[in-house]
């Protein structure tokens, strides 16, 4: 077997290189490949465990390292392939997981995977697994490994995903017990080979090592080390965090976890029986034994991590993964016990499994310690920094091992209680475990963290399940979820109505009990744990990060893949043993996009929710059982091998993707983020206990949160290029915001806890920030991007839970800030998840949002106060961060763009553009830049000393007067943009400079106009921000009054800017009108404002003609449209002295009469509404214009009023009259002679009446015509003469203006015309047709009988007499008819539509009338009836 394994491993080593080339394709392999599955499954079926022993040799070689790197991706493909072959691969995989619990089991898995890899070209992943497993198996007897292998193979064949898990698990357990001891020896002995391999691996490309291999190795190592629950679970926590990053994967993964938990429970039942004596005795026997086993197991893990460490020079991954593993160890035992009670049927097996897991944990810890020590040695050889980290990590591991051993004992003791609340306790334990891992990381001592350590053990178990599911998740996450759900049901694990919610299935009672126990345990160490966790987390994170660099270059690869958010978190989580909350915060900030993806794919299933919770520290925690179930699945054979491989491959791909994108420091930060996610998920899994555990330390967490938030804010403020800000703001900031708020907010009503946990988590994050500033700077760039969103006004800033979340921008404004919010979510998640599990165990996932626990009233009050203060602080930070982004925009325009133009000019040797034109394009930007730079400095200073002086509004009050400069910029904005476009068209050189600048990273591929628009949008942003700031201030606050004043100043500036904008629009409109007129006309004048425009029909002498009217505040423009689309200017009528009125006649209700000095006419609108609008607009304009004239000439106001009155009395000749249309008069309005073809109509120029030739023979000089002689009627001529005599001595007498042949004309007048005057009775002349005091007037059709033709006449009813006129302006009626004694009857005819009515006298038909419409007919009938009665 050994020789065979060695032979297989060398091929694996070459594959890593090939896989590295195919790193990008790795994520796609998620889809199961049947061929791959077939090849991988047979390999798994083969007894490859003996081959694992030779693998240690391969690890020593650099090729092995490469293999380890690429195998993760290969494994992903294999896993996908295995997904298709669920039956065979599942059996094999389940057996392997059991084997993982034992050393033998690990070997077969590796061998199978390696074979599959060789076939599939994914040998690298398998090699990683093999490398991890080989050291264990190398030390183990080959016989034991063979036996185990046989057992695993048998179990694989026996195991069904659901039915035969128990049988296989039993076999595996026996193997695990034997292998555990052998593994200890093997791990210890094999550590040197791994170390050498690691050292040699660093030579390989870090991407290769860090790619899929590191992920695969981590996961395999964890799976292999799973026999030691503590270490294994710790690793799983990391894995689960990584896995949980993609929501889809997380959902599948959670489901798989549940399935694995169920299968694990079944396996535990059989395994407990077999291994109760073995592993349980080992766990219970002594801490030393467990420590040894743990150390051995950890050795391989650490060693694998170490080889990758040399590849990752950046020690930023300061995640105390080892500490976390230790914490997980402690948690694992209680969690297992907790799971056991949850699974009543497999309770005994669960207990055994717990003991086995504890033993495994101890072994893992020992191995990890050994490996860390070796790694430290290697790191010392490689890098002093790595050595320092590894040494500290090793020390932490040793301490953690000791503490873990103690905690294991305590957990075993406490197991019964946890068993009752298996689901809840495991979840809560996970939460506590995270805190414990923090304590371990800090190195304060695991004794302090024993309680939380126990919880972390459960977390570790949960993580293990997640790791497996994570591995499978990449490729077969959906399958895993389904299997996990079924497995949970089989194992009788308490599951809510939604099988997908694996973490939630536990009943609320169990959860509560578990939480109480966890609270008791966690309450003791939490504070100490926090401090110790902080130190341990730093040290261990450094060490693990260094190792992870070597071992989990895959994490680096996944970080590179951070561009693919979904891939970032899921797999790189494994190596993080640091504070889970810290990881959460980091993950959210760095992997905001993945969180968003998780949020979207979020399924109704609990598994999906669990994944989301992991991703978003909030909801993932709710899946307590899912974590346990995943662990159980790992331990049990429930996980299908193909599924596991697929998940691993996907996780490795994700990890690779994420790692590849980020720097080593960033990788560390991301890993810490993953850890945070895991811890958050663990916490969510164990909300009750974990919640209580962390609750006691909520205040400390808050402190950490504050410090972290400050540190992150300070670091986050450092922005990358504006482009990065814009892009990251849009992508990363928005995604995390959505995911965090959507996932976390609904579940966590306990805002207090929500806030407290983040603070707790923030401490580790601060430490992480200190260690890995690179990641933080990237986060800060995303923060600035978020800040860049400031220009797009966003709704501020509150999270649904009432916690303040400034929006994507603020969350990302600083990694610390976003982490605080996420941490708050995580803490809130624990209580809310706990309560949510209770409330929604039988509900859909929606219940997680709808059903929330009720926070404590006292805590609520405190939360409200703190919430208000925090909101004010967050808004102030948002104002500052947005100001920083805006100043950067101004710098880009004022400095960077000018520098680009100057550089281009130097290259060409001549100016690209004139300085005068460039200054105009960038008009007023220098002043705005100086103003806002000073404003930013003061804001930053205030925020640094926020605790001392919580006020910022006074700064705006002080700078308020200078903000009016924005109005000047806004006023010239359109002109400057037009100038920019013009120069780009005319000047190719300048256009090239602009294009090149826009394509530069500094400009983020955004147009220059986009940035030039920012100052225009800034004042409205100030208004919104200050308004929100004021809303959250208490009236008693010192800054309340200043904020009101500042808001008033900003509103004034905004209004002024709006007015300026309007003026600019008015100017543009005036220019447009001027350009639309034919000829050269000066329409644009100072003070002239455009009011209204439209087309009205002008009643000319004969026909209606369209005219275009433009109304200004001082004149009415009267134009005629022409075919070219232009307008011919007829006249510009001044509003001075103009009158407008509507006619009194009913027939002309749509008409409008305008009288002015220059011209008067009747206008007809299309409707009465339009007529009224014009009438109102013109009347108001006339009134306003008259007021202005009085204002400018107050001394003449009275005189003007008198003159206007005089004009009204005697306007003759002073204004142009309205000419009566020709059609409205059929006779001379003076002599009543009828007009014919030869006897023509004439209009008097003084009064506008229609007169005949004889009546208009005189001419007279009129004022409105500048005293030019014009035809006037006799009446007007006499009146003008009288006025002339009154105003004498007048130089030009009327006689002089009379016609030249005045004497002749007098003679002609004396001669009677040949035309005979028609005698008209005086009665018919008493009333004119246009009389204004009539009861009714208008046009009607009249007929003297039914068969008579209709004739059109103008009728007037006055004094109960009906007058008939030929036209509306006739002075003499054609006839008159008294209406007394007549009756009116309406004729109801279908055709006539009630428009016809009859006039009867003594029942005899006199006339038949027809109106234009029924409405007017009804009015006429009423008028007639009124006239017929006395």
Curated annotation (Swiss-Prot):
GO molecular function annotations of the record: guanyl-nucleotide exchange factor activity; small GTPase binding; zinc ion binding
One Pfam family recorded for the sequence: PH
GO CC aspect terms: cytoplasm; cytoskeleton; Golgi apparatus; lamellipodium; ruffle
This protein's UniProt keywords: Cytoplasm, Cytoskeleton, Guanine-nucleotide releasing factor, Metal-binding, Phosphoprotein, Repeat, Zinc, Zinc-finger
Cross-referenced SMART domains: FYVE (SM00064), PH (SM00233), RhoGEF (SM00325)
Highest rank taxon of the organism: Eukaryota
Biased composition (Low complexity): 15-24
Annotated DH domain residues: 871-1060
InterPro entries, per database record: DBL_dom_sf, DH_dom, FGD6_N_PH, FYVE_RhoGEF_PH, PH-like_dom_sf, PH_domain, Znf_FYVE, Znf_FYVE-rel
Composition bias, Polar residues: 334-351, 728-739
Sequence positions that bind Zn(2+) 2: 1244, 1247, 1273, 1276
Residue(s) carrying Phosphoserine: 231, 515, 554, 605, 692, 721, 1197
GO biological process: actin cytoskeleton organization; cytoskeleton organization; filopodium assembly; regulation of cell shape; regulation of GTPase activity
Annotated Acidic residues bias: 831-847
Segments for region (Disordered): 1-36, 330-351, 516-538, 695-739, 800-869
Major location (coarse): cytoplasm
Zinc fingers classed as FYVE-type: ranges: 1222-1281
Binding sites annotated in the UniProt record for Zn(2+) 1: 1228, 1231, 1252, 1255
Entry's localization field: Cytoplasm; Cytoplasm, Cytoskeleton
Protein's job: May activate CDC42, a member of the Ras-like family of Rho- and Rac proteins, by exchanging bound GDP for free GTP. May play a role in regulating the actin cytoskeleton and cell shape.
Protein name: FYVE, RhoGEF and PH domain-containing protein 6
Organism field: Homo sapiens (Human)
